[in-house]
A protein has these predicted regions:
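Substrate-recognition element of Asp-dependent hydrolases with the DxDx(T/V) motif
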Residues: 83-136, 142, 146-148
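Conserved Lys-Pro-Asp/Glu-containing loop-to-beta segment of HAD-superfamily phosphomonoesterases
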Residues: 154-170
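N-terminal helical cap/lid subdomain that shapes the substrate entry/recognition surface
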Residues: 2-103
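Catalytic P-loop NTPase motifs of RecA-like helicase/translocase cores
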Residues: 13-14, 129, 154
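Histidine-bearing beta->alpha loop at or near hydrolase active sites
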Residues: 150-152
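ABC transporter ATPase nucleotide-binding domain signature
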Residues: 73, 133, 165
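Glycine-rich phosphate-binding loop signature in dinucleotide/nucleotide-binding domains
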Residues: 1, 114-117, 167-170
Length: 170
């Protein structure tokens, strides 16, 4: 018997690949990556993963995202635009267009909610996640958010999962 369900966010609920949120912005500005986008993204996400636990408050988290975007843009060969675009991207952090949803994510959560399942997020993310989930319209579906930077430990640490399960009464 299923008693509760947990979800990750990146590439489960929100599309995390730069091709969904960064490349359209660059195209709109007439900019084309000159470097290896995939390699730049892997390195930027590695930087984020290594530093996100420090981002327990919004100011620190937004600084982390600014540096993430700057590194990503530099890695893509867009050094001349990296500072300005990284500031712009961080300024848009509450814009739902910045966080495109995985197709079917909201419908799935809605259906699970309608069936009465307790739902939680368990994600390696920073302090921005609760507000991001609200602006994209997904926050209302969750009974609990276990966010690594807020909790102080990251997956695969079982404490993050345990926190969610205890909050759901499982």
């Amino acid at each position: 018997m299923v008693r509760a369900l947990t979800f990750d966010v990146g590439n489960t609920l929100i599309l995390a690949s730069p091709r969904f949120w960064l490349l359209p912005l660059l195209e709109a500005r007439g900019l084309r990556p000159r470097g290896d986008v995939r390699k730049a993204a892997l390195e930027a996400f590695r930087f984020y993963e290594e530093n996100h636990l420090k981002a327990r408050d919004l100011e620190t988290a937004l600084g982390l995202w600014r540096e993430f975007h700057r590194r990503l843009l530099v890695g893509m060969g867009l050094e001349d635009h990296a500072e300005a675009l990284s500031r712009e991207l961080v300024a848009r952090w509450k814009d739902p267009a910045t966080w495109p949803l995985v197709p079917g994510a909201e419908a799935t959560l809605k259906a699970l909610r309608a069936k009465g399942y307790p739902l939680a997020v368990v994600s390696n993310w920073d302090a921005t996640l609760p507000e991001i989930l609200e602006v994209v319209g997904l926050g209302r579906y969750f009974d609990h958010l276990s966010v690594s930077a807020v909790s102080g430990y990251a997956k695969p640490d079982p404490r993050l999962f345990r926190e969610a399960l205890e909050a759901l009464g499982v």
